[in-house]
């Protein structure tokens, strides 16, 4: 029986920043948040912080978001390793073109023992989960049978290991066509702060697919821990159905 995979979002990289020694400026933040402030001040050479209302890093970053000077957010980035996400969800995720992606390859990695992600609309309903599991098991059995027969057909009597590797890849790329959209995949996603804000604004909405909304909320919680001055304006709150959304009163992009 197919095992289910829970969503997991792991922070694996973030921006570091070093102030140039010849610039007479310091701030009360570090990493990406400091870099964003530095980039903004570099536009105007305002190293002396002439405006007391934007003297702190948090107040400066809030101001640039309020006025829509979002290009400076592009200098800092965060990378996540995301597991327990379905193929159907990553098909939506990769539509965000300002992210960079490296995803598990079904051509190189056999899916005989792959896990599945239960759609939120099915989750918790015993009857629906039974139907879902049966369908997932049937597709995986068909995959295994197709893979075995394709490998036997394509390998033939070719002795060379290089050709054998190619034939196995060709067998997997054909057999994977019967795997369900619910098949778990794993993906590294890197994006700058501006791209992450856009993703959260679009996908943490009530109108987004629930699986990718859960992903957006999970990413947001990690992002707030990394750069609160950039992401803490998003408020997470529950809906009547128990699911969560996130909204912000500040500038976002459609």
Curated annotation (Swiss-Prot):
Among Gene3D superfamilies, the record links this protein to: 3.30.1360.170, 3.30.70.3180
Question: Top EC class per UniProt?
Answer: transferase
Which residues are listed for FAD binding in this entry? 71, 95-97, 103, 192-194, 198
Zinc listed as a keyword: no
PROSITE patterns linked to this entry:
THYX
Catalytic activity of the protein: dUMP + (6R)-5,10-methylene-5,6,7,8-tetrahydrofolate + NADPH + H(+) = dTMP + (6S)-5,6,7,8-tetrahydrofolate + NADP(+)
**Keyword annotations of the record:** FAD, Flavoprotein, Methyltransferase, NADP, Nucleotide biosynthesis, Transferase
Q: How is the cofactor bound?
A: Binds 4 FAD per tetramer. Each FAD binding site is formed by three monomers.
Q: Known SUPFAM superfamilies for this protein?
A: Thymidylate synthase-complementing protein Thy1
Q: Name one GO molecular function term.
A: thymidylate synthase activity
Q: What is its EC number?
A: 2.1.1.148
Q: Which GO terms describe its biological process?
A: dTMP biosynthetic process; dTTP biosynthetic process; methylation
| All residue ranges annotated as the ThyX domain in the record | 7-237
Q: Binding residues for dUMP, per the UniProt record?
A: 92-95, 103-107, 176, 203
Quote the Pfam families the UniProt record gives. Thy1
Q: Which residues form the active site?
A: 203 (involved in ionization of n3 of dump, leading to its activation)
Cofactor(s) this protein requires: FAD
The pathway entry for this protein reads as:
Pyrimidine metabolism; dTTP biosynthesis
Q: Where is this motif: ThyX motif?
A: 95-105
State the oligomer form and interacting partners. Homotetramer.
UniProt record similarity statement:
Belongs to the thymidylate synthase ThyX family.
Q: What does this protein do?
A: Catalyzes the reductive methylation of 2'-deoxyuridine-5'-monophosphate (dUMP) to 2'-deoxythymidine-5'-monophosphate (dTMP) while utilizing 5,10-methylenetetrahydrofolate (mTHF) as the methyl donor, and NADPH and FADH(2) as the reductant.
According to UniProt, the name of this protein is: Flavin-dependent thymidylate synthase
Species of origin reads Mycobacterium sp. (strain JLS)
- Lineage, highest ranks first: Bacteria, Bacillati, Actinomycetota, Actinomycetes, Mycobacteriales
Q: Gene encoding this chain? A: thyX
């Amino acid at each position: 029986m197919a095992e289910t995979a829970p969503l997991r979002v792991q922070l694996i990289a973030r921006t570091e920043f070093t102030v140039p020694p010849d610039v007479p400026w310091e701030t009360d933040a570090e990493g990406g948040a400091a870099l964003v402030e530095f980039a903004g001040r570099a536009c105007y050479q305002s190293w002396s912080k002439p405006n007391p209302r934007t003297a702190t890093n948090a107040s400066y970053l809030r101001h640039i978001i309020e006025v829509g000077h979002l290009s400076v957010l592009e200098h800092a980035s965060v990378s996540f390793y995301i597991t327990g996400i379905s193929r159907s969800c990553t098909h939506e995720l990769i539509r965000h073109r300002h992210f960079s992606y490296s995803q598990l390859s079904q051509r190189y990695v056999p899916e005989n023992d792959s896990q599945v992600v239960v759609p939120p609309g099915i989750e918790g309903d015993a009857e629906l989960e039974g139907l879902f599991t049966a369908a997932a098991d049937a597709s995986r059995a068909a995959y295994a049978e197709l893979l075995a027969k394709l490998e036997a057909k394509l390998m033939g009597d070719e002795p060379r290991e290089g050709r054998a590797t190619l034939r196995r890849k060709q067998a997997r790329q054909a057999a994977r066509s019967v795997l369900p959209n619910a098949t778990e995949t794993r993906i590294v996603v890197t994006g700058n702060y501006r791209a992450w804000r856009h993703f959260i604004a679009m996908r943490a909405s009530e109108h987004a697919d629930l699986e990718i909304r859960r992903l957006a909320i999970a990413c947001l919680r990690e992002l707030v821990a990394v750069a609160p001055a950039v992401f803490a304006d998003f408020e997470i709150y529950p809906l009547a159905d128990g699911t969560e959304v996130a909204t912000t009163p500040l500038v976002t992009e459609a």
